[in-house]
Amino acid sequence: SRPLVAGGICVDERAHTVFVNEQEVQLTLKEYQLLCLLMKNRGAVLTRDVLLENIWGYNNESETRTVDVHIRTLRQKLGADGALIETVRGVGYRMGEHT
């Protein structure tokens, strides 16, 4: 399978690696799964509920902060390219087209 690419972010699912501008970035399993899901659905808004269901295996309104915290740490680890993960206020997140 081909790598997932967005901006300077490159995810190789077979090798389970993430590179940002050719530097390897260490992500937790949940951060990695979040990034893959967002990149595979690039341009589409994914609600917090959809993210919870797909990554954590449950859907609970009171747990949406879990998603927000993971998105925040994921953005930090991705550096400037973290800005590609856009917040859609009151809805969820999407992987944007450009930085």
Predicted regions and their residues:
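Positively charged, aromatic-enriched patches within helix-turn-helix-type DNA-binding elements
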Residues: 15-82, 87-91
